[in-house]
Amino acid sequence: MEAIRHDWTLEEIEDLLNTPLLELVHRAQTVHRDYQPANAIQLATLLSVKTGGCSENCAYCPQSAHYNTEVDPQSTLPIETVLEQAERAKAAGASRFCMGWAWREIRDGAQFDAMLEMVQGVRQLGLEACVTAGMLSDRQAERLAEAGLTAYNHNLDTSPEFYGEIISTRTYADRLATLERVRQAGISVCCGGIIGMGEGQRDRAGLLQVLATLNPHPESVPINALVPVEGTPLGDRDRLDPLDLVRMCAVARILMPKARVRLSAGRTALSREAQVLCFLAGANSIFYGDTLLTTANPVCEADRQLLADIGAEALEVVTA
């Protein structure tokens, strides 16, 4: 069994990314079986509670107010609607319900109070609850923990070196500080990134190094493939080679054996076979539902059929 480490070097991670694919997947699957249930995939449903109008300028994001896309700003969904969606997600087989707000940061007031009620309601349904809503204060993190929040998502997106090519309205240090506030409050960290934005292999290694040297490692690591959206600065990027996604999943599994590696945005561009390769490489969580915030996702029926065809089952979680 490979030991869990927090001292991975950039060179070691680059070497892993450049390992022959079959050898890499074999090693990742070996690590996976040492630390994870062999044939269980967590189903997580993601709902956009507040869509569009975000003041950040993330180059990939159609929700940014800086770009002219087909995503129009919408009002925040009411608590009742969100909890109804959570009930449907549970009935469909999801064990985690993730809620997203297109905000730069959380602000105190009625909308934050509503968020806390949503978290409490989701947990009362027996689901894990995850929130992604930008930066937050120490006290806000504490209140989310008191409400029962399972995990807070705050992605790093890419390496520190490439980050400035993607966003200028928030620093890398801001993101790391948010992760530390979440961790100090006793909330699990959900943190990953996006590939296919024009970054090099060293940038992918750099992202993974930052994640893998966090102590403890993130509880879950979303690996996203860029979904090019017309109107954003990255709208004309070519689609990612699916094998690059397999490599990222495999290396993430080797570096962070206990994390849930979540195969996230971009799955609609993957064949069934490519998705299975990602599972073989150590991915053990997917977003489950027809939409990911504002981009398409495979329908639930297709995912259920895929899991059945490969003999996998939905991961069951125990919630307090």
Curated annotation (Swiss-Prot):
Molecular-function GO term, any one: iron ion binding
Keyword 4Fe-4S on entry: yes
Residue span, Radical SAM core domain: 39-267
GO biological process per UniProt: biotin biosynthetic process
UniProt keyword Transcription regulation, yes or no: no
Family annotation (Pfam families): BATS, Radical_SAM
Gene3D superfamilies given in the database record: Aldolase class I
Key words of the record: 2Fe-2S, 4Fe-4S, Biotin biosynthesis, Iron, Iron-sulfur, Metal-binding, S-adenosyl-L-methionine, Transferase
Pathway membership: Cofactor biosynthesis; biotin biosynthesis; biotin from 7,8-diaminononanoate: step 2/2
Top-rank lineage group of the source organism: Bacteria
Subunit organization: Homodimer.
Function: Catalyzes the conversion of dethiobiotin (DTB) to biotin by the insertion of a sulfur atom into dethiobiotin via a radical-based mechanism.
NCBIfam families membership: bioB (TIGR00433)
Protein's recorded name: Biotin synthase
Species name: Synechococcus elongatus (strain ATCC 33912 / PCC 7942 / FACHB-805) (Anacystis nidulans R2)
Gene coding for it: bioB
